[in-house]
């Protein structure tokens, strides 16, 4: 089972976290018609310093697509945005590493 997890690596909490996710691409062979998933939106009030929250499950049926996560959050009164894109077929066991805050193996995108 694969999950998308937001990890706060800051020394202070982040608040008002808004995550938008979507998948898109040209099919498994790269030659097919355009494919895209629904756009999903998630909100989290706070992630404490060094904490994490599970955003959503990631389905293996979507690994052949670009999987994009756009994260907006506040530290104090300052807003930040980050975009994370998992390229097609990058979510594979060969790319697993130890993710210390979770105590699990996974694929870390920074």
Model-identified regions with their sequence ranges:
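Short acidic, flexible loop segments centered on an aromatic residue
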Residues: 11-34
């Amino acid at each position: 089972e694969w999950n998308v997890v937001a990890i706060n690596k800051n020394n202070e909490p982040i608040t008002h976290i808004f995550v938008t996710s979507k998948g898109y691409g040209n099919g498994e062979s790269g030659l097919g018609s355009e494919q895209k998933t629904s756009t999903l939106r998630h909100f989290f009030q706070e992630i404490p310093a060094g904490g994490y929250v599970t955003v959503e499950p990631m389905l293996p049926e979507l690994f052949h697509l670009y999987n994009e996560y756009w994260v907006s959050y506040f530290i104090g009164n300052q807003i930040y945005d980050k975009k994370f894109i998992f390229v097609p077929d990058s979510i594979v066991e060969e790319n697993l590493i130890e993710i210390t805050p979770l105590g699990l193996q996974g694929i870390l995108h920074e």
